[in-house]
From Swiss-Prot:
It catalyses: (2S)-4-acetamido-2-aminobutanoate = L-ectoine + H2O. Gene3D superfamilies: Jelly Rolls. The gene is ectC. This is L-ectoine synthase. Belongs to the ectoine synthase family. Its EC number is 4.2.1.108. Pathway: Amine and polyamine biosynthesis; ectoine biosynthesis; L-ectoine from L-aspartate 4-semialdehyde: step 3/3. One of its GO terms (biological process) is ectoine biosynthetic process. Keywords: Lyase. The keyword Zinc-finger does not apply. GO terms for molecular function: ectoine synthase activity.
Length: 132
């Protein structure tokens, strides 16, 4: 059994802030935990514009705090987000998140991220193998 708190993760190598400071992700469960997924708490700053494309991962996101917009860049659709909203990037959609207020979301990635990934110039996480 694994039990962790966000308090113990804060300011460790599991607590990642984007280079532009727009978002912060606390990686609660990572690939090294060997459970087949990773689980993160991500906070995105109000008024920021954030483009992502998880070409190698499926991501499920549940918004627990804040409001904003999700723009599906592949299908030219826009969605309002509020607490209780969930979106699933099961088609590896390129997307943009534009928070009106600070957004806090709980995210699940499959395959799991290892914690060493960095978004490339296209917003993509590379597929990093979990060492045996």
């Amino acid at each position: 059994m694994i039990v962790r708190t966000t308090t113990e993760i804060t300011d460790t190598d599991r607590d990642i802030t984007s280079e532009d400071g727009n978002w912060r992700s606390k990686r609660i469960v990572l690939g090294g935990d060997r459970v087949g997924f990773s689980f993160h708490e991500t906070t995105i700053k109000a008024g920021s514009v954030n483009e992502f494309h998880y070409a190698n991962h499926v991501e499920a996101v549940w918004l627990v705090e804040g409001t904003g917009k999700l723009i599906d860049l592949d299908n030219n659709k826009e969605y309002d987000l509020a607490p209780g909203s969930m979106y699933l990037l099961n088609g590896h959609e390129r997307h943009r998140v534009e928070p009106d207020t600070q957004m806090r979301m709980l995210c699940v990635f499959n395959p799991p991220v290892t914690g060493r990934e960095v978004h490339d110039e296209n917003g993509v996480y590379p597929l990093v193998e979990v060492p045996a």
